[in-house]
Amino acid sequence: MTDYSAFEVMGPIMVGPSSSHTAGACKIANVATSIVSNNYNQVEFQLHGSFAHTFKGHGTDRALVGGILGFEPDDDRIKTSFELAKQAGLNYIFTTTNLGDNYHPNSVKIVFSYPNGEEEYVIGSSIGGGAMKIVNINGIAIEFRGEYSTILLEYPEQRGVISYVSSLLTGSEYNIESLNTKKNKLTNIVTLTVEIDKPLTESLKSAILGVERFTTAKYVEV
């Protein structure tokens, strides 16, 4: 018999109508803004699966825009997120797409465009009960759920990186909730994802994110 928590049975506190289509969507967009650079001038929401079919009726569209604006799922401002985005000068568009069978039906690819013509994107999936997971960042397959503060690092395959990061964290009395690596066999680039039990101090941010060996170093605080 499977045990369920009260949260899983009752769902999160949120602006409705659907925990999957609004709360999860809002969280995806909110976390995505912590991953990319912050000087984007347009956001495109590419909706996949059931998101693509029901995004207007279920409020997914307003929840996504609200998440980009930094709102939490229980923030009443989600109801007026379109109007607030206009006031903030945020340009956004919605399109539908097929990301493929490997993606959860409630998935969205959020593309951030910058004044210099460059783009970044984040793919996230709403997996029920207001929970979500980020599954791809700029073509790198990863998985984290935004439940813990998370360090994201990319680097050419080499020894000592994991021990360097983990020793810094444990030496500063951090608990590592999860640590995962994925390697691109074509480029030998490794993606390291580390979830920790509390936010990084400024000194640890510098010690970890400021190291030259990392081609990408990002931090998402929860």
Curated annotation (Swiss-Prot):
Entry's EC annotation: 4.3.1.17
Pfam families in the cross-refs: SDH_beta
InterPro entries the record matches: ACT-like_dom_sf, ACT_dom, ASB_dom_sf, Fe-S_L-Ser, Fe-S_L-Ser_bsu, Ser_deHydtase_bsu
Biological pathway: Carbohydrate biosynthesis; gluconeogenesis
Class in the EC hierarchy, top level: lyase
Cofactor note: Binds 1 [4Fe-4S] cluster.
Cofactor(s) annotated in UniProt: [4Fe-4S] cluster
Keywords linked to the UniProt accession: 4Fe-4S, Gluconeogenesis, Iron, Iron-sulfur, Lyase, Metal-binding
Gene3D superfamilies named in the record: D-3-phosphoglycerate dehydrogenase, domain 3
Record carries keyword 4Fe-4S: yes
GO biological process: gluconeogenesis
Residue ranges of every copy of the ACT domain listed in the record: 150-222
Cysteine pairings via disulfide bonds: none
Catalysis: reaction(s): L-serine = pyruvate + NH4(+)
Subunit record text: Heterooctamer of four alpha chains and four beta chains.
Similarity field: Belongs to the iron-sulfur dependent L-serine dehydratase family.
Protein name: L-serine dehydratase, beta chain
